């Protein structure tokens, strides 16, 4: 969707953009996506929002909530901001990957870096929570343990009669 002198997508009631496809929203000079006093959810799809003015924009930043869930989003807002004028931004199953270090700033009501709203090159990618998969050692550490998992000192002969785990075996 491409427009001149208007928002590519303008709405006044809560909206969810969803589906397996891609939405390309471009406005030559206003907002690519404009959530006027309401909430926006982007769920399990790809959204590319680009404008010389605002990329993805709320109205006042007093109550509008933006939720991005398992989605890929790029946003450009050349003069004002890529994602701005929202009260909150919730990311579920995705994270801001570009520019590095960018995050939602509640004072500026948008995605910012170094105290300024990000205006171009904003990328949010799904499947990157920022937490890596843990690496689990499959070998039990050598030693003598109680059934509660407490490590004991000394040898097995030094312990009182009972059940113990020795080198990972009862």
Regions found by a protein language model. Give the residues of each.
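C-terminal outer-membrane/trafficking sorting elements
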Residues: 128-170
């Amino acid at each position: 969707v491409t427009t001149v002198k208007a928002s590519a997508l303008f709405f006044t009631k809560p909206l969810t953009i969803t589906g397996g496809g891609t939405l390309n929203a471009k406005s030559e000079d206003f907002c690519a996506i404009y959530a006027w006093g309401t909430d926006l959810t982007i769920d399990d799809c790809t959204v590319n929002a680009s404008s010389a003015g605002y990329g993805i924009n709320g109205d006042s930043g007093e109550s509008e909530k933006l939720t991005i869930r398992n989605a890929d989003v790029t946003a450009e807002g050349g003069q004002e901001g890529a994602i701005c004028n929202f009260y909150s931004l919730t990311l579920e199953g995705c994270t801001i990957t570009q520019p590095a270090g960018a995050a939602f700033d509640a004072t500026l009501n948008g995605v910012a870096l170094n105290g300024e709203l990000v205006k171009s090159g904003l990328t949010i990618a799904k499947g990157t929570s920022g937490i890596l998969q843990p690496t689990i050692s499959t070998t039990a550490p050598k030693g003598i343990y109680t059934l509660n998992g407490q490590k004991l000192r000394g040898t097995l002969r030094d312990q009182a009669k009972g059940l113990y785990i020795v080198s990972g075996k009862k």
